[in-house]
């Protein structure tokens, strides 16, 4: 197995483990504390990486005072969107499952294209095929079947509430991607990630102090806190750094295909680590979502 294939395999496996980790932390930590610790630790790691590997980018920004205010405004807005996105996403995971998070993550891809198509001509060209709409419809139907069957099995509305949180998160993420696309024309994506994660972590920390939730951390063992910090490192390295590497070295086509494999990896790891089980209808609906997204992304893949 060559190096590129090794990277692909490790990415799918590590991302498959990432959702159970987030689900586990969402159960044991209040959302504001969870996100503030994870984002501040992960953001700090990315800042260190930027200082070591991307000093030229930082010098370029400092050397152009005119764009500093421009970037600060957009990065701050991006941090706000990231804060909202992860608030709803973590709450969604708390009430659903790791697999549900990965399924809804797939739905974000075609939704992002639709929203981007409103503002960018190159994205608008991608939604002119009927296959896109057929695929999007299949994905939505599949996700609804998944949610309905899950909430019926639980016998309460918690799963349905979690699904609403996840839908809200992927909508915010789609709008957030528009800002990323605009800012990425000015600075490297890794620098964007470092800035966004740090700003989002600070915002979550302020909210945690304001709501007094931060004091709940006093009752948490040092082992769990270290685990949460490590989860922040893990999320940044797999969800951002490895993703950037694959997009840069292997292309968006390969990246999108790998994204479609993550729910399978998540289902297996979620079963082994969290004892999460799915019924036959949820399994079929998950496959429908994946097929729908493959159709919706088909033209995009050809163009990349």
Curated annotation (Swiss-Prot):
GO terms for cellular component: plasma membrane. InterPro entries: AA-Vitamin_Transporters, EamA_dom. Residues 13-148, 171-298 form the EamA domain. It is a multi-pass membrane protein. It is found in: Cell membrane. Its main location: membrane. Pfam families: EamA. The keyword Cytoplasm does not apply. Keywords: Cell membrane, Membrane, Repeat, Transmembrane, Transmembrane helix, Transport. Disulfide bonds: none annotated. The chain crosses the membrane at residues 9-29, 67-87, 100-120, 131-151, 159-179, 189-209, 222-242, 252-272, 278-298. Belongs to the EamA transporter family. PANTHER family: INNER MEMBRANE TRANSPORTER, S-ADENOSYLMETHIONINE_S-ADENOSYLHOMOCYSTEINE TRANSPORTER. This is Uncharacterized transporter HI_0687. It comes from Haemophilus influenzae (strain ATCC 51907 / DSM 11121 / KW20 / Rd). The lineage of its organism: Bacteria, Pseudomonadati, Pseudomonadota, Gammaproteobacteria, Pasteurellales.
């Amino acid at each position: 197995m060559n190096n590129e294939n090794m990277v692909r395999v490790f990415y799918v496996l590590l991302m498959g483990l990432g959702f159970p980790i987030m689900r586990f932390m969402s159960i044991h930590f209040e959302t504001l504390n969870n996100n503030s610790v994870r984002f501040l630790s992960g953001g700090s790691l990315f800042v260190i990486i930027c200082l070591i590997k991307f000093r030229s980018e930082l010098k370029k920004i400092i050397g152009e005072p005119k764009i500093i205010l421009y970037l600060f405004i957009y990065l701050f807005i991006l941090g706000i969107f990231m804060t909202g996105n992860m608030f709803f996403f973590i709450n969604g995971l708390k009430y659903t499952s790791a697999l549900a998070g990965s399924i809804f993550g797939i739905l974000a891809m075609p939704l992002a294209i639709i929203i981007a198509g409103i503002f960018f001509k190159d994205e608008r060209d991608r939604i002119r095929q009927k296959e896109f709409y057929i695929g999007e419809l299949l994905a939505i139907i599949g996700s609804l079947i998944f949610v309905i069957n899950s909430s019926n099995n639980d016998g309460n509305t918690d799963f349905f509430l979690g699904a609403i949180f996840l839908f809200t998160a992927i909508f915010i993420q789609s709008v957030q991607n528009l800002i990323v696309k605009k800012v990425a024309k000015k600075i490297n994506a890794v620098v964007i990630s470092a800035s966004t994660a740090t700003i989002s972590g600070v915002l979550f920390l302020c909210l945690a102090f304001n709501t007094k939730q931060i004091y709940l951390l006093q009752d948490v063992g040092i082992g769990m806190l270290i685990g949460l910090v490590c989860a922040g490192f893990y999320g940044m390295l797999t969800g951002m750094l490895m993703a950037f590497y694959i997009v840069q070295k292997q292309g968006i086509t390969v990246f999108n295909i790998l994204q479609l494999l993550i729910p399978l990896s998540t289902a297996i790891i979620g079963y082994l680590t969290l004892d999460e089980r799915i019924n036959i209808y949820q399994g079929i609906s998950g496959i429908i979502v994946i097929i729908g997204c493959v159709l919706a992304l088909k033209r995009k893949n050809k163009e990349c």
